[in-house]
Amino acid sequence: MVVVNAENAVVGRLASYVAKLALSGEEITVVNAEKAIMTGNKEYIFQKYVQLRTRKSISNPKKMGPKYPRRPDDIVRRVIRGMLPYKKPRGVEAFKKIKIEVGVPEGVSIDINLGSAPNTIKYVTVGELSQFLGAKF
């Protein structure tokens, strides 16, 4: 089992790395999901996720999909799923091998640290985005 630290890691780069490991057969745990970062304008990122969450259908608003998550671990899981062929059996098996954690559980030693100091001032953490969307974690 490989433990990946997501602190200060760009979400897309983290997701592609984790997806490639999962497709090769590794079991992966991603810790500190709330500290991963999304680069770009903060207002634009917030506006994009609010727009995705508030989409409704005229015929039946409760059944309109796709449903977008609020919690940081689920947001990161959704981004990783986008890097996998999740509609095929190979992608389903790879997606089952990925676990996402908020914080670091007790007794877990970190194997891979993908984060570095952000080299831009335009970024938002997944935790800030989750709190803006109304998550309680």
From Swiss-Prot:
Record's keyword terms, sorted = Ribonucleoprotein, Ribosomal protein
Give the domain of life. Answer: Archaea
What biological-process terms (Gene Ontology) are attached? negative regulation of translation; translation
For whether the record's keyword set contains Nuclease, the answer is: no
One MF term from GO for this chain? structural constituent of ribosome
Offer one Pfam family short name for this entry: Ribosomal_L13
Q: Name one GO cellular component term.
A: cytosolic large ribosomal subunit
InterPro entries on file:
Ribosomal_uL13 (IPR005822), Ribosomal_uL13_bac-type (IPR005823), Ribosomal_uL13_euk/arc (IPR005755), Ribosomal_uL13_sf (IPR036899)
Q: Could you tell me which SUPFAM superfamilies the record lists for this protein?
A: Ribosomal protein L13
Role noted for this protein: This protein is one of the early assembly proteins of the 50S ribosomal subunit, although it is not seen to bind rRNA by itself. It is important during the early stages of 50S assembly.
Which family does the similarity line name?
Belongs to the universal ribosomal protein uL13 family.
Tell me which PANTHER family the record gives.
LARGE RIBOSOMAL SUBUNIT PROTEIN UL13 (PTHR11545:SF3), RIBOSOMAL PROTEIN L13 (PTHR11545)
Q: What's the subunit arrangement here?
A: Part of the 50S ribosomal subunit.
NCBIfam families, sorted: L13_A_E, PRK06394.1
Q: What is this protein called?
A: Large ribosomal subunit protein uL13
Lineage, top ranks = Archaea, Methanobacteriati, Methanobacteriota, Methanomada group, Methanococci
